Amino acid sequence: MLVSIEWLYNNLKDVKVVEIDYNPQISYYEGHIPGAVLINWRDFLSDNSRDFASPEKLSKVLGNAGINNDDLIVLYSDMNNRYAFYAYWILKAYGHSNLAILNGGIYKWLRENYPIDNDAVVVRRSEYKASKPDWSSRILVWELLSRLKEIVLIDSRSKEEYDGLTTAPPEHKCEQTQMSGHIPGAKNVPWTTLLNDDETMKSRDELGRIFSWLNREDRIVVYCRTGARASVVWYALKEVLGFRLVRLYDGSWVEYGNMVGVPVEKSISDHS
């Protein structure tokens, strides 16, 4: 599920490489992996509500990218590869199981001096058929609030966000919430602690030590600001370490930190 830079380079003709970008004009057109098609992160979202796309819309998005249902999709992204993990979580829910993530993403690809292209890839449209999503790995705020005492919460944001020093990370500093802090009982495991300096994911043994405080029977919920960073933690727990009961709260702090009447904890005093 995590493929190396070398493996991808040797298998470029046999897979569909997809770059998932938050800022496509900044990332993809400045240089991308040869043959990689671009999918804007927002294409996974619904046009009519704050939710994910319908199967019909997702089918069109993937079909326009020339992807077939049986293709092996290798994902990478900008923003420290976080949206590759988020896309993995979404696509798996919609029934595409033949998925992999480029370990280290575009950063490691460039760092090791592999070739890049600057022009958009011309693709032949395919007829993709997305399934009705299986959201068993997702939790909505209503259920979350009713189960706060039953679940193990992991906040994967930075310590500054978790403590309540800021309501948004530096890369999204204009997108503040009304409240700072964290969901009561949540333990802070910043997503970056799961990655090496070259942005590859740490080994199974290292991840096991990071999460040694968890029990296999725990019902785990991970969250961050919008779900992207939390998807890295979800992947490590579910796909690498094999925890069965892991769900992602994609509403995350953008939703929770703007809700009226919900409980909030802070690790600092609020003098406002």
Residue ranges, per PLM feature:
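Helix-loop module immediately N-terminal to the HCX5R catalytic loop
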Residues: D43-I73, K187-I220
